[in-house]
Amino acid sequence: MWICPICKTTNETNICRSCGFDLSKDYAMHRFLCQLSASGRKIFKPVQPGDNILMASSNTDYVFGRKMDRTKITTIYFRNKKENIGEDAWDVSEKQNGSIMAWTEENRDGFKDLYLAANGNILANKDCSKLFSGYEKLKKIVGLQYFRTDQTENMSFMFDYCKSLASLDVSHFDTSQVTDMLGMLGMFNNCERLASLDVSHFDTSQVTDMSYMFHECNGLKILDISNFDTSNVKNLSVPLSEYLAVPQEYV
């Protein structure tokens, strides 16, 4: 038995069942494990708010560093509090400091729900390429407002082949730093069930590649790209209007 130094919860396993602190982890913020004190508490430097940076996850054979079939996940939950952490939780922070924990739970449909939790907002990695690519059975993303993208430089194929995703709120996405050469290449490629998508606020002034950005988004009825700045786009492949299979409204 030990007492978590963060939330003071009594635990039996190495991972705190409330906040996800890992007793056996060599935390990057401290670099060594301290000896247990007489009170049973472990001392380490607390994670700072700016450390909630999510790891990159561009290998579609993995889910944030863990070998897993992405097509088995139907819902992704972003949480701004680390509580009720699952027993199979693993560290998905870029710095491996325990600031962001992930776990899965079986749902009623026989598939899995994926949870991502941190104390505060989750900061997107600079490289978000293929972050959600290949989640073909993914129906919804809950709590995406807790996911900040203001430091992200590459969003290529970010939601590629999310073929079952019926709605997606990216209205809060900050794309001002998207400067990578691939930029927004195939960002929403094959999101065929999306009926609407609000990208009207996207800052595309530094993006050089928008190829296949909305390719095969056959379900889209309304798409507002009137504010898109394509002055630096070197590769558009085909005009944006031709990505869409049905008549669209451009507000």
Identify the function of each model-found stretch:
Residues 11-12, 23:
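Cys/His-rich microdomains that often coordinate metals
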Residues 12-14, 137:
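Short glycine/proline-enriched coil/turn segments at helix->beta-strand junctions
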Residues 16-19, 28-31, 140, 167, ...:
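Short linear functional motifs in flexible/disordered or boundary regions
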Residues 38-251:
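Negatively charged
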Residues 8, 20:
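Cys/His-coordinated zinc-binding microdomains
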Residues 3, 15:
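The −1 position to Zn-ligating cysteines in a subset of zinc-ribbon hairpins
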Residues 21-39:
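Short microdomains enriched in Cys/His and/or Lys/Arg
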